[in-house]
Design a protein with these regions (language model features):
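Histidine-centered active-site microenvironments of extracellular/periplasmic hydrolases
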Residues: 143-154, 221-224, 234, 257-313, ...
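Bacterial Sec-dependent N-terminal signal peptides
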Residues: 1-25
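Active-site segment of extracytoplasmic enzymes that catalyze sulfate/phosphate-ester chemistry
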Residues: 31, 39-118, 122-128, 142, ...
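A short aromatic-rich beta-strand->coil structural motif
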Residues: 29, 35, 123, 135, ...
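A short beta-strand-to-alpha-helix junction
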Residues: 47-52, 69-74, 106-117, 184-193, ...
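C-terminal cap/loop subdomain of S1 sulfatases and analogous C-terminal strand-loop tails that border
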Residues: 278-297, 314-323, 328-414, 445-446
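Short, solvent-exposed turn/loop segments enriched in Gly/Ser/Thr/Pro and often Arg
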Residues: 44-49, 64-86, 94-96, 132-143, ...
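Formylglycine-dependent
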Residues: 95-129, 136-211, 215-229, 242, ...
C-alpha cells in the first residue's frame, strides 16, 4: 500500500531524495489549507477559549510547530507561495486577487502564470494522481475570464469555488462567497469538499495521490447549519464564529475517520495549517495575543498553526519550538519526502525542511524570510497598532518591518518579544540598515510587474 502524506491546510536546482524515503513506495499527499484561521483558533494552541477536539487529536498524534509562517497575510499570495515555493510577489501577486480594475490598482497580475513551477507539476511528473478540491483564488472568477484552467497547474481533476476558473455550479450560484441559491449551502461546503477528497482517494488507490483540500472555512461570512441558522446576529459575530469552527472541527474528524476506513490512515502524513491570520481577532484571542491580523505582517497575520501527523513515522505528542519554517518550504520539502524533483530553471525561495517535518531534527531556514503586502485603497483594515508596514524580513530571531520608501522601520526580537511590543530599531541602527536594504532591494528587483 502506498505511503500517504496529508497536508492540512504557500531553492534552485534538483532535490535529492532521502535514502530512507527512496526505499519506500511513494506517499500520497493531501494538502488541507484552512482559510483565515488564526493560531489562537485551536484549543491545542490556546488557553481553551474555543474547543477543537478533533484537530487537537490530530496534534496529539503528531508534531506541532510554533514557528511556521505563511508567505503572505492574505489569501491569494499565500496560496501562490505554498504552490510555487517562491515568495508570491515574485509572481506579481501581493494581495487578494480581485476584479481586473482592483488588480490593476494593486499593481498586481490577474492570475498566477501557468508557466510557474508548482508542487502538482513536480508530483505528477513523479507518477502521482493530482486533484485540487476547494478554494483556488490564484486567478479566475469575478471578471477575469482568461485565467488558465486549473489543469494547467498540474491537476488532473478539480472542484473549485467562485474564486477560480470554471467554478462548481452547485456551490457557486452567484459571484459571491455564498448564496441562498447554492445547491450546497454555505454550512455544508466543507463536508462536500471532504466527501470529494475521500472519493478521489478511494478511486485512485492504485497509485500515489496528491490532493489539495482547501476549504473556505474559517473565512467569513460565518453561517452555521440549520441548527443555528437563521439567527439575527451579524455574520461576523463571535457566536457564529464558534458555531462554524465547531462544525469545521467535526469535518476534520470525519476526514480522518474516512482515511481509517480507506485503510490509509497509518500511511498518511497530516499537516494542518492556515493561509493567513484571522480577522476579526476578537481582541487578539484568535491570534493568541500576537499583534496584528489578516492583512498585517505582524505575527498575528503570518504566524500560523502547523501540525504534522504520520503514525508510525513521526513521533506523537511532540512540539517543535525551534524550527522556523515558511510555506514556501513545503514544495521542496514534500518533493524530498515523495522522491519528486523540483522543476528546473527557477530561483526558489523555499528550502528543504523535510527533516523538521518528519521530526528527525529541528531546522531553521538559512535564507531570509521575506514578505510584501500591497497597500492601497482596499486595505482599510487593520488600523492603528495592528497595521504594519508593507515589507518584512526575518533573519534568525530578528524581524524587521519597513515600507518600500525606507520609512517606518520597526525591529523586533521575536524570540523574546513574540507579540512585537518593543521596537528595537533605535538600538540597532546598523542591523536595521542592512535588513531594510535587503528587503527593499528584493522588492524592487524581484517582484513581477503587471504589464497590462
Amino acid at each position: 500500500m502506498n505511503k500517504a502524506i496529508l497536508l492540512l491546510t504557500a531553492c534552485g536546482g534538483l532535490i535529492h531524495t532521502m535514502d530512507a524515503t527512496a526505499q519506500k513506495q511513494k506517499p500520497n499527499i493531501v494538502i488541507i489549507y484552512t482559510d483565515d484561521m488564526g493560531i489562537g483558533d485551536l484549543s491545542c494552541y490556546n488557553s481553551g477559549w474555543v474547543a477543537t477536539p478533533n484537530i487537537d487529536k490530530l496534534a496529539s498524534q503528531g508534531l506541532k510547530f510554533n514557528h511556521y509562517y505563511t508567505s503572505s497575510p492574505v489569501s491569494s499570495p499565500s496560496r501562490v507561495g505554498l504552490t510555487t515555493g517562491m515568495f508570491p510577489t515574485e509572481w506579481g501577486i501581493n494581495t487578494f486577487l480581485h476584479e481586473r480594475k482592483g488588480n490593476a490598482d494593486c499593481e498586481q497580475c490577474d492570475y498566477l502564470d501557468s508557466n510557474a513551477p508548482t508542487m502538482a507539476k513536480s508530483l505528477k511528473a513523479a507518477g502521482y494522481a493530482t486533484a485540487h478540491i476547494g478554494k483556488w483564488h490564484m486567478g479566475g472568477g469575478r471578471d477575469v475570464d482568461d485565467a488558465p484552467q486549473i489543469p494547467k497547474y498540474g491537476f488532473d481533476e478539480y472542484v473549485t469555488t467562485y474564486e477560480g476558473p470554471d467554478p462548481d455550479p452547485i456551490i457557486t450560484a452567484s459571484n459571491w462567497i455564498w448564496s441562498e441559491k447554492d445547491s450546497i449551502q454555505r454550512w455544508d461546503r466543507t463536508a462536500y469538499f471532504v466527501d470529494k477528497t475521500l472519493d478521489y482517494l478511494a478511486r485512485h488507490k492504485d497509485k500515489p495521490c496528491f490532493v489539495n483540500l482547501w476549504p473556505d472555512d474559517m473565512h467569513d461570512p460565518w453561517i452555521p447549519s440549520s441548527g443555528f441558522y437563521p439567527i439575527s446576529e451579524s455574520w461576523a459575530s463571535r457566536n457564529n464564529f464558534v458555531a462554524v469552527l465547531t462544525q469545521y472541527d467535526k469535518q476534520i474528524g470525519r476526514l480522518m475517520e474516512g482515511l481509517e476506513q480507506l485503510g490509509i490512515r497509518e500511511n498518511t502524513l497530516v499537516i494542518f495549517t492556515s493561509d493567513n491570520g484571522a480577522l476579526p481577532t476578537f481582541d487578539n484571542a484568535r491570534t493568541n495575543g500576537h499583534r496584528g491580523s489578516k492583512n498585517s505582517i505582524y505575527e498575528g497575520g503570518v504566524n500560523m498553526p502547523f501540525i504534522v501527523s504520520w503514525p508510525g513515522t513521526i513521533k506523537a505528542g511532540e512540539t517543535d519550538n525551534e524550527s522556523v519554517i515558511n510555506a514556501v518550504d513545503l514544495y521542496p520539502s514534500l518533493c524530498q519526502i515523495a522522491g519528486a524533483k523540483l522543476i528546473e530553471g527557477f530561483d526558489y525561495s523555499g528550502e528543504d525542511m523535510s527533516q523538521a517535518l518528519l521530526g528527525i531534527k529541528e531546522q531553521r531556514r538559512t535564507k531570509d524570510m521575506m514578505w510584501d503586502f500591497g497597500r492601497n485603497k482596499y486595505f482599510n483594515k487593520p488600523q492603528k497598532k495592528q497595521r504594519s508596514p508593507h515589507l518584512g524580513i526575518r533573519r534568525g530571531d530578528w524581524k524587521l518591518l519597513v515600507d518600500s520608501d525606507g520609512k517606518n522601520i520597526e525591529l523586533y526580537d521575536i524570540k523574546i518579544d513574540p507579540n512585537e511590543t518593543t521596537d528595537l530599531s533605535a538600538k540597532h541602527p546598523e542591523l536595521c540598515s542592512e535588513l531594510s536594504k535587503k528587503v527593499i532591494d528584493w522588492y524592487f528587483t524581484k517582484r513581477k510587474v503587471r504589464t497590462k
